[in-house]
Amino acid sequence: MVSDTDTTTAIAQPDETHDVALTSWLKSANQHPDFPIQNLPMGVFRTHDLPPRCGVAIGDSIVDLAKLAASSPFDGLAGEALSTLTGPTLNPFMQLPPNYASAFRLALSRSLRADSPMEALIRKTLISSHDVEMCLPCSIGDYTDFYTSIHHATAVGKLFRPDNPLLPNYKWLPIGYHGRASSIVVSGQPVYRPNGQVLRPEAIEPVMLPSEKLDYEAELGIFIGSPSPQFSP
């Protein structure tokens, strides 16, 4: 068993799980360009015979957290956190206070390190990353878009107000807007042109057509864990 009795508060700074000297009993994790033991990113995956489930990437494998939870390997906060990771999304885990996530990460890191007594148990939960398909990690109902690039705001403003592109309030308010998010997919999915009504020149009635000009932009999206109370930022 791995206990987290020494991890009871949120960890704001890098801790022992980020130690560059750490190595794992899983050889593919050592010197891995993306998923060494210092990373341990979480996500949701599925296989041809397993439904969507939570996992952690390590080397060329994924730790099946539902299978790991069945053996109750961790005590305290880490164990409680693991119990929220048996479903098809990370939402229940993300709603926990930060110290739960820190405790879980620490316990998992210790179990994956070289000479860990938990090697045999963890090996039974590993699935090759080549045999999985990644899924959306969370159930996404809506989003808040923060307008944070002053260069982008100025460029857009010039289209509408060439002489006054950046309004004064931009530098004083966290400009943001809220909307629904119904078409988010994981990487590698085909992009479909949206359909809309188009009124051709000289036409009297519009027609429904796929978009003939498709623009795109790159944005940074982040997941924020615990929801804020209603009417509070």
Which residue ranges define each predicted feature?
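Short edge-strand/loop segments of extracellular domains
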Residues: I62-V63
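Charged, compositionally biased non-catalytic regions
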Residues: M1-D15
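Active-site microenvironments in enzyme catalytic cores
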Residues: A12, T17-L50, A57, A66-P233
